[in-house]
């Protein structure tokens, strides 16, 4: 294991502690809670394993991703500019790039996944949507995808599988409790985080960047049901 990652995990690999207030406030949850993640438990019964099989079947098509601070990290884009879409900020005018986003051939090969994204996912607009594969022994060094000024739950990370030994760890917060059977979490990626696959299987997740548009009500219902399920 990389020395930097080993030290990071020693300092931060613990159970995340989240306390749910009695009253649900969607704006507070997303914008003000300071939570590093939030499980969308109302989506727990989706066909994650079928989606995993679709992604796994394309494993040899994935592109190497961010070699500068990772090892064994690869991606494949379902919705974007092409099947190897990077951060939209790297293409110039972000607004113009967003206008060009569309389904790639990958989505055509993954009908169950595409159906989830079009019929179930509670947002009107999809930005970049990618499968992310981390090979056995692979890792992603501690990094921050957004600035501190953009602190909010803004991206969805779905574990299509999460073999025992795989860890996604937020600095100062702890380990995200992803489920190997599939689970969806809203994430605040302004927090420093790192990932390590200490297993003998590829770890495949799906990352959804999105805009709610006119589906605020749908998102509200998913958030509220998840909140009270998580709270118990």
Predicted regions mapped to residue ranges:
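Intrinsically disordered, low-complexity peptide-like regions
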Residues: 15, 23, 80, 141-143, ...
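A residue-level signal for beta-strand positions that form part of recognition/binding surfaces
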Residues: 37, 128, 203
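Structured loops at beta-to-helix junctions and adjacent beta-edge loops in soluble globular domains
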Residues: 43, 68, 78-81, 134, ...
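Catalytic core of Fe(II)/2-oxoglutarate
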Residues: 162-232
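Non-heme Fe(II)/2-oxoglutarate
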Residues: 1-120
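Intrinsic-disorder/low-complexity, polar/charged segments enriched in Ser/Thr/Lys/Arg/Asp/Glu/Gln
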Residues: 35, 153-155, 205
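A short, structural micro-pattern
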Residues: 70, 125, 152, 200-202
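Catalytic core of non-heme Fe(II) oxygenases with the double-stranded beta-helix
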Residues: 114-185
